């Protein structure tokens, strides 16, 4: 089940985002330590969508979608270990469908740092296509790396 998360869901969203197998993959050198991270301000912003994924009442993952403009949203994917695989692909497509049905969104994009092969593979499995490279745009472990830009449109 996909649902829009609110401030009342902050504990679960924080738990997913700061999970030891998730946070290192979604954070860069400018982010706070996982224990200091608080998603509450993002959940309080009506322009940002946080879509939670639950299986039989158990939180499995979530997507944070931030607007670039009226119709384009950048997705940040956070799937807990044990829930990755075919079900996560279905859930990602459901989350994207939710955005297309319930918001002005007509395009979802994501940025994947060079070297994050699992994230790149997942994005392509859910139908995203490579659209370009943003050179030297991500700082991780003291190294500056490129990011791959991928996207999918409502019509696709």
Model-derived features: where do they sit?
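Conserved GNAT-fold acetyl-CoA-binding loop/helix
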Residues: 21-39
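Conserved acetyl-CoA binding element of GNAT-fold acetyltransferases
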Residues: 70-82, 111
């Amino acid at each position: 089940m996909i649902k829009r998360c609110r401030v009342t869901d902050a504990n679960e969203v924080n738990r997913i985002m700061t999970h030891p197998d998730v946070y290192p993959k979604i954070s860069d050198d400018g982010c706070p330590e996982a224990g200091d991270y608080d998603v509450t301000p993002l959940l309080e912003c009506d322009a940002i969508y946080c879509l939670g994924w639950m299986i039989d009442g158990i939180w499995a993952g979530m997507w944070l979608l931030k607007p670039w403009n009226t119709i384009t949203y950048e997705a940040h994917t956070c799937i807990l270990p044990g829930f990755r695989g075919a079900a996560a692909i279905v859930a990602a497509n459901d989350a994207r469908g939710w955005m297309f049905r319930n918001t002005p969104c007509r395009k979802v994009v994501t940025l994947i740092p060079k070297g994050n092969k699992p994230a790149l593979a997942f994005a392509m499995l859910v139908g995203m296509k490579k659209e370009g490279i943003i050179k030297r745009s991500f700082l991780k472990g003291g190294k500056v790396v490129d990011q791959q830009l991928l996207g999918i449109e409502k019509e696709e």
